[in-house]
Amino acid sequence: MTDQPKHILVASCLIRNMQNQILLVKHHIRGWELPQGRVEEGESLIFALSREVLEETGVTISHAKLAVVWSKVSAPAAMIFCFNARYASGELTPSEETPYVEWCSEAEAGRRVSHPTNRDRIIALLESDDTLQFRSYATSPYRLLN
């Protein structure tokens, strides 16, 4: 018998405020990106998403809608569930993991986010409509598979 595949589950979110700005966090390794984090055992995707957003940014979200599911096929394999959401409440509060948290325009987000995986996630979310999308990618080197 072979080992069962093990995938890391990640929830990520493009959050917009009333001025239509996007919330970005700056991770100490990956640079600027959307708030995201691992889904812990026993958590629903929405609970994990809300928890990660609050931990990394100090804000709460509303109207979270699943828009894009990404499959990372390279080890460690991961499924990344990407949502669009609205800012609900709270003050921007950096964390140890994300020392910078800022609202910015779509254009500024495009300039700040340099990691190709994170850039493609933002583009997919910005281009999303009411249909759920599926994308897959590999790393080393980074390449989209569909």
PLM segments and residue spans:
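Conserved N-terminal beta-strand and adjoining loop/helix that marks the start
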Residues: 1-22, 69
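Short secondary-structure boundary/capping segments
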Residues: 5, 14, 24, 84, ...
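Residue-level preference for alpha-helix termini and adjacent loops
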Residues: 8, 31-33, 38, 91, ...
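Conserved Nudix-box catalytic region and its N-terminal flanking loop in Nudix hydrolases
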Residues: 17-55
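Short active-site-proximal "capping" loops at secondary-structure junctions
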Residues: 30-31, 69-73
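Nudix hydrolase/Nudix homology domain
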Residues: 32, 99-146
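Unchanged
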Residues: 39-62, 72-121
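Conserved S-adenosyl-L-methionine
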Residues: 64-68
